[in-house]
Amino acid sequence: MENLKKMAGITAAEFIKDGMVVGLGTGSTAYYFVEEIGRRIKEEGLQITAVTTSSVTSKQAEGLNIPLKSIDQVDFVDVTVDGADEVDSQFNGIKGGGGALLMEKVVATPSKEYIWVVDESKLVEKLGAFKLPVEVVQYGAEQVFRHFERAGYKPSFREKDGQRFVTDMQNFIIDLALDVIENPIAFGQELDHVVGVVEHGLFNQMVDKVIVAGRDGVQISTSKKGK
């Protein structure tokens, strides 16, 4: 599995050219993309500026001497490469297993090209087997939790080391055990209207390319948005 993730990450790095502003994703597959960018800077003299999607990725990038700016210091991002927890046949996805979904979406939105790197196990016909992360402000988080309980969404507060997990933006995450999401676009819109919800892990019709590493090698699929 790690080899597949590495293959996908290295393939994605081939899309990066001198002079680009590059969004560096977060997670186990995006990790290999960031490592390959660091190698290319060191060995090939690749010249880029990067923005990151989490404190974890920032630390990794700094260790590789990748030049960084904040998202507010750039007008746009040429290419962002990130992982995904599930990807359906309509190029909708669930992200946020690593807890960085808000920053990931903030960086993805001004990106001219948005690429996901995944192994083939992440491809699904319908989203929902992976718990859907919802980032909520700490104030009133219990109210949001009870709202999700009443709706039958089987919520749980994400925890780390016995405490509630706190994101880089100092919010909580409520994971929803939905089993299947029949209409991701409509459900995303529903979540957008829940007071106290900052962002959710549905990335609907945002991605341009999906790089999938499997037993038969690497395949690149392009969405309607990316064509």
UniProtKB/Swiss-Prot annotation:
Catalyzes the reversible conversion of ribose-5-phosphate to ribulose 5-phosphate. SUPFAM superfamilies: D-ribose-5-phosphate isomerase (RpiA), lid domain, NagB/RpiA/CoA transferase-like. GO terms for molecular function: ribose-5-phosphate isomerase activity. Its EC number is 5.3.1.6. The gene is rpiA. The lineage of its organism: Bacteria, Bacillati, Bacillota, Bacilli, Lactobacillales. It comes from Streptococcus pneumoniae serotype 4 (strain ATCC BAA-334 / TIGR4). The keyword Protein transport does not apply. GO terms for biological process: pentose-phosphate shunt, non-oxidative branch. This is Ribose-5-phosphate isomerase A.
